[in-house]
Amino acid sequence: MPARFDPPSSTVSHRPVTRSCSARRPTPPKPQFKNNPPRSQTPDPKTRALTPLPSLSPSIPVKSAAVEKPWKTHDCRLVLEDGSVWSGRSFGAKGTAVGEVVFNTSLTGYQEILTDPSYAGQFVLFTCPEIGNVGINLEDMESTQAHMGGMLVRHLSLNVSNYRSAMSLPEYLEQQNVIGISEIDTRAITRRLRDTGCLNGIITTDASKSDEELVAMAKDWTIVGKDMISEVTCAEPYEWSDPTGEEWEWAAEAKASTKGSLHVVAYDFGVKHNIMRRLASFGCRITVVPASMPAAEVMAMDPDGILFSNGPGDPSAVPYAVENAKAILGEVPVFGICMGHQVLGQAFGGETFKLKFGHHGGNHPVRGPSGRVEISSQNHNFAVKPDSLPKEVEVSHINLNDGTCAGMVYPAMRAMTIQYHPEASPGPHDSDPCFEDFVVMMKAAKREKAI
């Protein structure tokens, strides 16, 4: 029978607490409130009234979180395939969703994580206890929609305070048909995932389904071997033209000297906007193509370099991407990020495997070829087996948490890959020089071609 877990101890309790001590004088009884929560009593005239400050940007509406009531009853369940059941409060969409539960250790950037296509098919549990306090804005989207299957949080902020906020997190999730659950013991679930590995789960607001039915549904679903990339890739090629304002111009000098001279074709496995912003900041012209576009059609676009982007799921489920990579290797410089790293790893002749609980967060240490340690932003559940690679391929980066392969170079093929996210969003920018390395590689290849 599924094991049920009570809500965390911080949940409001309405049972009276009695204390007795014969050595103390009895205290007068506290006033009994009939309303829940209690209305404020007559204010003390000596107490200074707090007057809210006027908005610094009155023309920008700042909305509060669309939470019905902070004391509403638990109306949602998270059911894991191991039989554990966690009761909580729903926010966002209603209904039932299935996915793989992973935990993310980032303290900021829930909007970027929510809109990262790499999270398609997954429920993201945030280890940060407070989520939703800055709402949702229109500038920090990493794609045009939310992709994660569900959101798990300890506490959903009841107030939104940010001058850029356009809507609350619950409002956005409802708009995007993503279900969320709060007031669950995220620390206990994280420890469970750490010890047992990733687990499939069900989030539901449907009280008619039994726990046993939901456990069976979770066990029947799997992300392994499933082509998730086809669900997030673009339908047809397009030119990246998103304006990059001053806040994104980190390489203005390089952009001025490169503008328009380098053409990058990006295979869209679920590419994040900030990856393209970073390449555009170096003056690259970017054409984004569907994940299944044949290599011959891509090479007909006369690219100076090929980007194999990040994306969701299992690299072994997309053999068409591996075959395209094999056909392109040696023709022009290539750069693989995250899923692109795994696809190129298989194209090099290597193998990939599923990690126990994956790497998800903005605080993962990686050692590069110079010995310098970078703090990186990571989001992946699969990795490349170093001992399966041919001797011509060098492992350039190592994840210092578990020793897994975090980057490769294949000098003869002008190929470089990293298993994590140099563009961050969210996360540190320690690995941003990878984009410049790719640009330098393309410039060198173009000079040789001109000779």
Where are these regions (language model features)?
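Active-site-proximal beta-strand elements of phosphoester/diester hydrolases
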Residues: 263-267, 376-377, 416-420
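N-terminal chloroplast transit peptides
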Residues: 1-25
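Proline-centered loop/turn at the N-terminus of a beta-strand
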Residues: 179, 263, 333-335, 351, ...
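RNA-binding accessory domains that recognize and position tRNA/RNA substrates
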Residues: 2-3, 25, 30-33, 39-301, ...
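Cysteine-nucleophile active-site neighborhood
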Residues: 300-375, 381-386, 427-445
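Catalytic beta-strand/loop cores that center a nucleophilic Ser/Cys/Thr
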Residues: 372-413, 450-451
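Short solvent-exposed loop/turn micro-motifs enriched in small/polar/acidic residues
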Residues: 69-72, 359, 390, 400-401
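Active-site glycine-centered loops adjacent to acidic/histidine catalytic or metal-binding residues
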Residues: 185, 338, 380, 421
